[in-house]
A protein has these predicted regions:
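Metal-cofactor-dependent catalytic cores
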Residues: 1-158
Length: 158
């Protein structure tokens, strides 16, 4: 799907948790396509470049921004941590249950919990806080089914 940005000044309010920011619609064609695909009314939008959504300053430096991400623009997890969790589960789960942006291999289990930063090439990323344990981990992203046993969240918080 190729999306074109609407050549209009229209802005829409988009809410992520308790934060409302202005968003720019893509096009009616894109909205129709995603609505048909989902079987429900939906819209494609992108962040208004003139709008700012600040990251929680309890975990980041003042002035750091995020767009429509939950709290931070990236989520880091190690393969070793997932492998360790799967050893404790009756039915293993895939990495996509955690919707990571970066998956690191070759570490010990939970090594990433103590990292303050990582470097990929010349780019340095701050590791600011562990990810909050979220009910979304109980939803299979391929099927959209909720795990009736509450796993893997039950094991993670247990």
């Amino acid at each position: 799907l190729n999306l074109r940005v609407a050549a209009q000044e229209t802005r829409l309010a988009a809410t992520v948790w308790d934060s409302t920011v202005m968003a720019m619609p893509a096009s009616e064609e894109a909205d129709d396509w995603i609505s048909r695909y989902l079987g429900s009314s939906a819209r494609f939008v992108h962040m208004d470049p003139d709008c700012q959504r600040m990251i929680d300053t309890g975990f980041a430096r003042a002035g750091e921004e995020v767009s429509f991400a939950d709290g931070f623009p990236m989520l880091l997890i190690s393969q070793a941590s997932l492998d360790g969790l799967n050893r404790r589960l009756a039915e293993p789960v895939g990495m996509l249950r955690f919707r990571p942006s970066l998956v690191v291999a070759g570490t010990t289990e939970h090594a990433e919990d103590g990292w303050r930063s990582i470097r990929i090439g010349s780019v340095r990323f701050d590791v600011v806080k562990p990810c909050a344990r979220c009910v979304l981990t109980t939803v299979d992203p391929a099927r959209g089914d909720l795990d009736p046993s509450g796993e893997p969240l039950r094991t993670l918080i247990g």
